[in-house]
Swiss-Prot record:
Enzyme Commission number, as recorded: 6.3.4.4
Gene it is expressed from: purA
Name of this chain's protein: Adenylosuccinate synthetase
Organism: Methylococcus capsulatus (strain ATCC 33009 / NCIMB 11132 / Bath)
Catalysed reactions, as listed in the record: IMP + L-aspartate + GTP = N(6)-(1,2-dicarboxyethyl)-AMP + GDP + phosphate + 2 H(+)
Taxonomic placement: Bacteria, Pseudomonadati, Pseudomonadota, Gammaproteobacteria, Methylococcales
Record note on quaternary structure: Homodimer.
Amino acid sequence: MAKNIVVIGTQWGDEGKGKLVDLLTEHANAVVRFQGGHNAGHTLVIDGRKTVLHLIPSGILRDSVTCLIGNGVVLSPEALMQEIGVLESVGLSIRDRLIVSEACALILPVHIALDNAREAARGGKAIGTTGRGIGPAYEDKVARRGLRAGDLRDTAGLPERLRELLDYHNFMLTRYYGAQGVDFQETLDSLLDLGGKICPMLGDVAGILHRYQSAGENVLFEGAQGAMLDIDHGTYPYVTSSNTTAGGASCGTGVGLLNFDYVLGITKAYATRVGNGPFPTELLDATGEILTQKGAEFGATTGRRRRCGWFDAVLMRRSAKLNGLSGICLTKLDVLDGLPRIGICTGYRYDGQEIDTVPIGADNYARCEPIIEEMPGWQESTAGIRALDDLPANARAYIRRLEETTGVNVDIISTGPDRQDTIVIQNPFAAG
């Protein structure tokens, strides 16, 4: 029987989704991205070789898997072709296995210019975007003035639509932000060139997924960023511009909600956040520095240093409800090796009261102080362990406590960056 499995990040992104998608595609016929853009950075390590993907689904490293980019993704034609070029340079076949939705909103150079101009204008109140034009492209999509991937086929009508869009945005860039405008002819020439390469890969992704469902094919839906960066449910305004929760898999691909069978939440054994925004369990001491350095907590897309802190069970309970999690994949357990004590946030102090929920809004959330429960650490190495019983006793106790405090079973444990450094307790494709 066909299984549709959704993989999402449960925290603030960078949880290790790429590795798990790559691992699970052994059982999948297709992998589809459903939101975000090339602001994502999914790092895969296979047989010691590191690959970082930003836009193309993580299943691309398996020759038998079809990869799709759904309508919920904002697509940079330039970034897509650059990524294809990098993968083809190491001998991978890409273009015959990649299908891009005609309904994808396009990211243009003017969106990048707007993104950077806005962040500069915000100064100390900057959101901390990746500067890739994601937000402005989503704005144009919602305002119904943006270009879509299918428009690349209409070479006759493209110039007029592009000029209208650039006139609108260049007015804002030059008159309001005092920045340089974006050149029309240069943008048009680039789009026509890139369009000729991308158009053969365009297709009706929703229709293809419907056919897969009818044919009994397994499909993996790959989320980007994390649930607490969701435009509606995250720590607004320090969020991304798309729905990063599991519900985004439906509207971002055209697959109905009742067709999803399992939602796997990828969760670090501690917490990280990149950019600005409230982070109650953040560690600004030597332990935080250990997590940063040992966990190599630097962004795959921007190289920015990630802030590190203890696991937040309050946030995870919220995330579990928002996403309807079926199970958790716990990643980077090995980063905690050697710590004498490990903390878990089980509640917050908020305006003098103890609460066990996440307040709405960044200003309210910033007033929360974590209530930390400490557990003994372990000195043994967990790196590369592939059987649950081989983990140190204190590591197993830590995992059990995470299950108790979040209310969700840990079905998979990642003990290292390589595809095989994994303990699979319950395979989502085999779940009843």
